Amino acid sequence: MNERSLRVLEYNKIIHMLEDKCTSSLGREKLKELKPISNFEQITTWQKETSEAQSILIHRGNIPLGGIHDVSQYLRRTEIGSYLDPGQLLQLKETLAAARRMKTFLKDDKKESTYPIIQELGNNISSLKHIEDKIELCIISETELSDNASPELRNIRRQISSKNDAIRNKLNSIITSASNQKYLQDPIITMRQDRYVVPVKQEHRGNIPGLIHDQSSSGATIFVEPMAVVELNNQLKELRLKEQVEIERILMEIAAMIAERSDDIKSNQIILKELDFIFAKGKLSVEMRAVEPVLNTNKKISIKNGRHPLLPSNKVVPNTMWLGEDFHTLVITGPNTGGKTVTLKTLGLLTLMAQSGLHVPADYGTKLAIFDQVFADIGDEQSIEQSLSTFSSHMTNIVNIMDNVTEQSLVLFDELGAGTDPTEGAALAMAILNSLREMGTVTVATTHYSELKQYALSTEGVENASVEFDVNTLSPTYKLLIGVPGKSNAFEISRKLGLSDFLIQRSKELLTREDIQFEDLLQNIEKNRSTAEKEKDEAARLRMETQKLREEYYEKKQQLQTQKEKLISDAKREAYKIVKQAKLDADEIVENLKTLRAELEEKEMNKKIEEARKNLSDQMGKLAENMGEKLVLKTNKKPPKNLKIGESVNILSLNQIGYVILPEDANGEVQLQVGIMKVNMHVSNLERIKEEKDTKKTGVGKIVKSKAENIKMEIDVRGQNLEEAMLNVDKYLDDAYIAGLTHVTIIHGVGTGVLSAGLKQMLKKHKHTKSFREGEYGEGGMGVTIVHLK
């Protein structure tokens, strides 16, 4: 596409607007490749993907495309056997997570068949959750690995911590010793060259034996490693070296996992770049209230209420324009600042946007043609260095256009033939337009020349147009009128501004008779058009009022019908309620009668049951007396003692369970309840039943146990904003408190420090917080906060 045309039509500003819509550097990199093309099939595909993105944004809102990083260099490092530092691994994890979220987001779409292009991209994303989880397990922050990265690392760090404590204890005994106080500059322990030292006064350097590692800038203090801790420091150094070796081993292990799936990660990155770019186009379409144009290759243009995309939406005047059917050349005339150039630029820029796969700010049904080139000669771009006049500058560009134009091109001229003698300029303009017309090229030109108005009126395939001007307010309306030649309005504007009628009349006398007749004709045409336009608007208004009255009538009629149906429905419902209540009352009376009858029958039945129970009890008592010897044949060598009322016992001779209702009497017998019977048994025939304690936990204890089993000792809020993190931490602290945890860890990372500071402010006031501190070495350092709960 012609670079000069892209520049004068301000295509680069559209690219800048798209850049703001991208969420990653990958999408912005893709934008650099975007240029208008003339391949119909490719443009159609681009337009369809923009429409899919627009539809998803409208129906589902924001897209989970955050957290994408360019990890190409990281992948190359793993492929050659190198490892990545923790910060780089975190970026790679975020990119993998973004790809997985996007895949899930697109997979969850209920209308996925409506978005075949974007859905196919989503289906091709590889989910690499195992790599995400490995990095999550091992990396605490941009600079530190977790103790959980490996058992060996945890063990080494435990030894380092123990060794640190031993060194500090030894040094504390030295600096707190009364005999050493006078030799020390300060009673503190510090570090020099990764070794623990104490500050000793220069003049007492020999009083504390040890290795000198550094001195102060003034020379008054030397930093000595006492001999008592040299060996401990050496052991600590060895442990730190072992720690570093283990860290590198873990990082190499992760790098090997990444290298193994390097191709999948590269493919994901390409897809994420494409999706970011596509959704940037969709966001721009939504913002501009743009539509997908109907494309064609037969040079037909029909823009419905097109708006210049770079003008404020509350100020731009929509315009309708068409050409390519009955005419291929459009000549636009009218006063300066009337909007002719904006109209020209709107057509050119909308064409470039459409051929770049972008939607255009216009109404549905807008049709645009695909051109092999868009040529534009707009504005005064004369070269001072080349000493070119306005006319020469324009003519140089026009010569270039005429040398390269084809019948499939779009040509835009602003003030064609201006900058030279009007007669010669008009003649040149007509010759250029005629040459392009004969070639079949779609051409739009703006001009002041009356000769070009007459040329358009008298030449087949050429049409006049103008921008409307309100003489009463001396301001343009910016409305394009196709088929109506423009009028300069010089005399009317001059009169309104105060020029005397005498001078205006003298000016008219200097015009030729043909010029006067032509201007009068244009004035009559404009007057008739304006009248017709007003009558058309009035007719449309009356038609709308009639339609509104008709709709109100039908609405009233519908309301009355609805009210009528509601009254009938309410009456039926009320009648049904009365009948239903009457039935319920009747049923209640019947039930009461049945209950009364049942109560009478139950009393009679209970009386008979009681008589039967009494007879059975009497017979069992007699049986027990007559067969007492047989009942006690089976005895307990250790009869139970001190049986209490309510205790359960096993009756050995009957193999039945009974409950004590009367304690042991002088004869050693107790009275038992066995089922419905009461029997007397000797204690030697009884065996005490040991009751099992109910150890089942219920109620609050069970809930707390469940909480304690489910609540982790740490919460990770990295990547969350402060408000989201505070909500999650607050809920987590509640759960941890209920679960009975004594302390927990909040992982927030280092970053800018905003998240850490905000959470610490919250912890100061939290009801469950007893105390909190930053993590120590091996716990996560500044990237974590340890909270002790009340």
From Swiss-Prot:
GO terms for molecular function: ATP binding; ATP hydrolysis activity; ATP-dependent DNA damage sensor activity; endonuclease activity; mismatched DNA binding; ribosomal large subunit binding; rRNA binding. Residues 715-790 form the Smr domain. The keyword Ion transport does not apply. One of its GO terms (biological process) is negative regulation of DNA recombination. CDD domains: ABC_MutS2, ATP-synt_Fo_b. Its EC number is 3.1.-.-, 3.6.4.-. It is an enzyme of class 3 (hydrolase). SUPFAM superfamilies: DNA repair protein MutS, domain III, P-loop containing nucleoside triphosphate hydrolases, SMR domain-like. ATP binds at residues 334-341. Keywords: ATP-binding, DNA-binding, Endonuclease, Hydrolase, Nuclease, Nucleotide-binding, RNA-binding, rRNA-binding. The keyword RNA-binding applies. Belongs to the DNA mismatch repair MutS family. MutS2 subfamily. Homodimer. Binds to stalled ribosomes, contacting rRNA. Endonuclease that is involved in the suppression of homologous recombination and thus may have a key role in the control of bacterial genetic diversity. This is Endonuclease MutS2. The lineage of its organism: Bacteria, Bacillati, Bacillota, Clostridia, Peptostreptococcales.
